Amino acid sequence: MSESVHTNTSLWSKGMKAVIVAQFLSAFGDNALLFATLALLKAQFYPEWSQPILQMVFVGAYILFAPFVGQVADSFAKGRVMMFANGLKLLGAASICFGINPFLGYTLVGVGAAAYSPAKYGILGELTTGSKLVKANGLMEASTIAAILLGSVAGGVLADWHVLVALAACALAYGGAVVANIYIPKLAAARPGQSWNLINMTRSFLNACTSLWRNGETRFSLVGTSLFWGAGVTLRFLLVLWVPVALGITDNATPTYLNAMVAIGIVVGAGAAAKLVTLETVSRCMPAGILIGVVVLIFSLQHELLPAYALLMLIGVLGGFFVVPLNALLQERGKKSVGAGNAIAVQNLGENSAMLLMLGIYSLAVMVGIPVVPIGIGFGALFALAITALWIWQRRY
């Protein structure tokens, strides 16, 4: 049954609760599945360099479908798009459980995630508006952060107990998300009847990319956020190999605990940025970006668990302080030039392309036999230099 949109819809309406629950379960599954599947690769004696390939097939789906998923979200009821996307994730996780190639199953999850992303943000504006919309976005981000923390840890802890149990828990989470999506009101499509000419859709998307790249502020933001998230994903995989070498700990849970420290730090840094940085003073965030690389370098040399926890939380604080102002700048300037939806789609393309590139370089470094500690040192140094170059470039323009 279709329901009309009411601008004064309660923040805790049935539909909004369903969206938040679905988002939590879907993000929980995403983060738990990564570490559960990494544990499966270890158990099945896949080479170490294959671990980042797992994430590469995931982000590859984002890149491949980037020009089209926004229109999919606008052409159908967003709650149903979310349900279909979570269904794809469920299919991918279940296929890994039943012994299908993990890279194939994880690719299916990536396709689902690519379709899910624009729908989950777009539906908030259809369920509520005004000050409630800001609060709804806050609830969405809070549920996502909680899911990242709990999902990452659950994936590692359950995998230490039994890999199949961890994978089944991920499939169960996606199944719960599908059920939650059923309770989202079937709202009218935002822009029905659009052309599905793939060439025109791709051309329109590329025009948005060109427009944002030609603007100095949005170009600066795109490069900065892409470098940050590319580095963040690479750090996740670096930790998986670094923990047994530097700390002598071989379980699956410890890397997830360390990743959780970064997520907690990002929340703290984001809060500080909201108070200390404005769109007019975005350059204040740049020293934090440079320090991320420096602290990663120092972290790579550690051999004790407590300093590792502290340094990773510091990396998260610096990361939150760095990336939040850049996101705000892109959303504000992009909204005026190509529209907020297109700006987010282009940003997703940039960030996932950076992830693909950095993970590819990291995988190659592991494949040729470079030890993980020197990889971490080089990674930190190169990131610091890249952000320094970006800052100099921004000041020139």
Swiss-Prot record:
Keyword terms, alphabetized: Cell inner membrane, Cell membrane, Lipid transport, Membrane, Transmembrane, Transmembrane helix, Transport
Cellular compartments annotated: Cell inner membrane
All ranges on the Periplasmic side of the membrane:
1-17, 74-90, 166, 248-256, 302-304, 365-366
Q: Which is an annotated GO molecular function term of this record?
A: lysophospholipid:sodium symporter activity
The cross-references to InterPro entries, in alphabetical order and at most eight, read: LysoPLipid__transptr_LplT, MFS, MFS_trans_sf
- Family that this chain belongs to: Belongs to the major facilitator superfamily. LplT (TC 2.A.1.42) family.
Protein name, as recorded: Lysophospholipid transporter LplT
The protein's organism comes out as Escherichia coli O127:H6 (strain E2348/69 / EPEC)
Question: What gene makes this protein?
Answer: lplT
